[in-house]
């Protein structure tokens, strides 16, 4: 996926989860943050950030904050990107005989990100974007997510009903050793992920090639459900 009109700036502060103050070419600007998560380990005053200049004149903010440099690692933090990255990756042929892709498909009380048909296979997929990294380990979630727990339970129900089910973690950066659930932040999500795998839900993690103006799915990353 490619972006246009990218500008580099320095992060100053985040008054609330929707906006941030940044400096671009010596001028302070208010920008929209395309991730309502906490991102405290990323948005540190003075770090280099990447912003997309909006095409629409009537917006309240002129820029969208989409990426940040953390040490030598460039991290895309746009929460709208993972589904787009996954779809592009799908279309390169992971599922043989893929003939149908539908986004936002309802199953019982949940709406999953994707429903796929590949030959005789009927598949539900839930996609999660990952921006939290500690010492080369990718972690999800960065805040408690009861919605995430609900999705895992209902993916298990889909398996019991005869479907295939996947949860796919799109790690929005490169150079990751492995992925593991963030049990320090939300033990219930980690427990639910382990239980979902036991019940037949498949778990995939993919890292991404990230530049200032692009992001693309890269390689599979090892998933560790019990750290160590």
Swiss-Prot record:
Protein source organism: Desulfitobacterium hafniense (strain DSM 10664 / DCB-2)
GO molecular function, one term: DNA binding
Family: Belongs to the SfsA family.
Protein name: Sugar fermentation stimulation protein homolog
Highest taxon of the lineage: Bacteria
